[in-house]
Amino acid sequence: MSAWLDEIRWTADGLVPVVAQEAGTGQVLMVAWMNREALALTAAEGYAVYWSRSRGRLWRKGEESGHRQKVLEIRIDCDEDVVLLKVEQAGGIACHTGRHHCFYRVLQDGRWVTVEPVLKPPDSIYGA
């Protein structure tokens, strides 16, 4: 039943990078990590579950904010070492900064420039 998990080339730490892509637009929303349990739960539950390296625990996307990611499709790349999730993003906010996606800065003239607006201030999402 879990043979498909054995096909993934996990890092030495037992993780795999995961790209979350908005299914309707193709926009890359975020990049995170999963361990074997997180990927199995994601497939079973139909909602994104990641591994938080900073907290050292499973993290269900949207568990605090309500901005869950409904997983429509799970793909693996040709090298079997990156996972792609095609998702529907609840609330239109994927980034903890209150933006639609995490890639809101662009390199311009040797410096990072913010080019995407905050849709909802983080303190109103997570509390002060």
UniProtKB/Swiss-Prot annotation:
<comment type="function">
    <text>Catalyzes the hydrolysis of the adenine ring of phosphoribosyl-AMP.</text>
</comment>
<keyword id="KW-0460">Magnesium</keyword>
<feature type="binding site">
    <location>
        <position position="77"/>
    </location>
    <ligand>
        <name>Mg(2+)</name>
    </ligand>
</feature>
<protein>
    <recommendedName>
        <fullName>Phosphoribosyl-AMP cyclohydrolase</fullName>
        <ecNumber>3.5.4.19</ecNumber>
    </recommendedName>
</protein>
<dbReference type="InterPro" id="IPR026660">
    <property type="entry name" value="PRA-CH"/>
</dbReference>
<dbReference type="GO" id="GO:0000105">
    <property type="term" value="P:L-histidine biosynthetic process"/>
</dbReference>
<keyword id="KW-0368">Histidine biosynthesis</keyword>
<dbReference type="GO" id="GO:0000287">
    <property type="term" value="F:magnesium ion binding"/>
</dbReference>
<comment type="subunit">
    <text>Homodimer.</text>
</comment>
<dbReference type="InterPro" id="IPR038019">
    <property type="entry name" value="PRib_AMP_CycHydrolase_sf"/>
</dbReference>
<comment type="pathway">
    <text>Amino-acid biosynthesis; L-histidine biosynthesis; L-histidine from 5-phospho-alpha-D-ribose 1-diphosphate: step 3/9.</text>
</comment>
<dbReference type="GO" id="GO:0005737">
    <property type="term" value="C:cytoplasm"/>
</dbReference>
<dbReference type="GO" id="GO:0008270">
    <property type="term" value="F:zinc ion binding"/>
</dbReference>
<comment type="similarity">
    <text>Belongs to the PRA-CH family.</text>
</comment>
<feature type="binding site">
    <location>
        <position position="78"/>
    </location>
    <ligand>
        <name>Zn(2+)</name>
    </ligand>
</feature>
<keyword id="KW-0963">Cytoplasm</keyword>
<feature type="binding site">
    <location>
        <position position="79"/>
    </location>
    <ligand>
        <name>Mg(2+)</name>
    </ligand>
</feature>
<keyword id="KW-0862">Zinc</keyword>
<feature type="binding site">
    <location>
        <position position="95"/>
    </location>
    <ligand>
        <name>Zn(2+)</name>
    </ligand>
</feature>
<dbReference type="GO" id="GO:0004635">
    <property type="term" value="F:phosphoribosyl-AMP cyclohydrolase activity"/>
</dbReference>
<keyword id="KW-0378">Hydrolase</keyword>
<feature type="binding site">
    <location>
        <position position="81"/>
    </location>
    <ligand>
        <name>Mg(2+)</name>
    </ligand>
</feature>
<feature type="binding site">
    <location>
        <position position="102"/>
    </location>
    <ligand>
        <name>Zn(2+)</name>
    </ligand>
</feature>
<dbReference type="InterPro" id="IPR002496">
    <property type="entry name" value="PRib_AMP_CycHydrolase_dom"/>
</dbReference>
<keyword id="KW-0028">Amino-acid biosynthesis</keyword>
<dbReference type="Pfam" id="PF01502">
    <property type="entry name" value="PRA-CH"/>
</dbReference>
<keyword id="KW-0479">Metal-binding</keyword>
